[in-house]
Amino acid sequence: MDTRLLVIAAPVLVAASWALFNIGRLAIQQIQRLSR
């Protein structure tokens, strides 16, 4: 594994997981609001 590749991949993975986490949390809030 090339170190430079890891340096590039790590922030991308962090950003992607953070975005998915936020989208999932918003989706759950919307579903809870609709189900009420």
From Swiss-Prot:
**Main location per the UniProt record:** plastid
Molecular function via GO: manganese ion binding
Which InterPro entries does this UniProt record tie to the protein? Answer: PSII_PsbY
Q: Membrane side Stromal: which residues?
A: 24-36
Q: How does it sit in the membrane?
A: Single-pass membrane protein
Query: Could you state one GO biological process linked to this protein?
Result: photosynthesis
- Give residue ranges on the Lumenal side: 1-4
Q: Where in the cell is it found?
A: Plastid, Chloroplast thylakoid membrane
Q: Membrane spanning segments where?
A: 5-23
The answer to whether the entry has keyword Membrane is yes
* UniProt similarity note: Belongs to the PsbY family.
Subunit info? PSII is composed of 1 copy each of membrane proteins PsbA, PsbB, PsbC, PsbD, PsbE, PsbF, PsbH, PsbI, PsbJ, PsbK, PsbL, PsbM, PsbT, PsbX, PsbY, PsbZ, Psb30/Ycf12, at least 3 peripheral proteins of the oxygen-evolving complex and a large number of cofactors. It forms dimeric complexes.
Task: Quote the cellular component terms of the Gene Ontology held in the record.
Answer: chloroplast thylakoid membrane; photosystem II
Give the highest taxon in the source lineage. Answer: Eukaryota
Supply the name of the protein: Photosystem II reaction center protein Y
Keyword Transcription regulation listed? The answer is no
What species was this sequence derived from?
Answer: Thalassiosira pseudonana
Keywords tagged on the record? Chloroplast, Membrane, Photosynthesis, Photosystem II, Plastid, Thylakoid, Transmembrane, Transmembrane helix
Function noted in UniProt: Loosely associated component of the core of photosystem II (PSII), it is not always seen in crystals. PSII is a light-driven water plastoquinone oxidoreductase, using light energy to abstract electrons from H(2)O, generating a proton gradient subsequently used for ATP formation.
